[in-house]
Amino acid sequence: LPTCKSVISFGCRFPVGTLLCKSDIPYTRVRNSITPKMDAIALDFCIAMEKYQVICVPVPTNESQWDNNTGRWRSIVSQKHAAQAAGLGTIGRHSLLITPEFGSMVWLGMVLCVQEFEPDKIKEPICDHCNLCVDACPVNALEKPELQQQLCWDYAFGDDEEKQTWRIACHKCRDICPYNLGTQNFIS
């Protein structure tokens, strides 16, 4: 959107119970259910704003394209960086957004808008770089300062050939994070 003046970021809580399951089915199913929900919220918002002659564009929650320059998958705009700039939370060592309310258990949506809005205050960093996520990563995708995205994704996402289904098979960095419930719900 060439005339974009604001990015509106929003989040939906991701159920923590999915981290406790031995099966990867609940986590995958919830992720696959939340994604279209977030896209629908963004679309409905854009349609509603047009009643006020405000042009907005929904950014797809999960669709991305390969960037040969960086060797990473990229969306139109980085959801987590936009959410951090919008004051929803801060990005942790594991490269996930951590919010005070929901920790890293949040799924993000975004809308680009031609209307300029007052931004929220940027949050103070939550992650203290304890490196539990670095130590827990089975493929060492967090050893460098920046997530080695393809290494992570090749291990975490894929097909279960036996069951002929697509699964999210790893979320150890999210499991181990002491702030996966946020700071307001932190349990020591």
Segments (PLM) and residue ranges:
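Non-catalytic, usually N-terminal nucleic-acid engagement modules in DNA/RNA processing proteins
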Residues: 1-31, 35-36
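Catalytic cores of enzyme domains
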Residues: 27-188
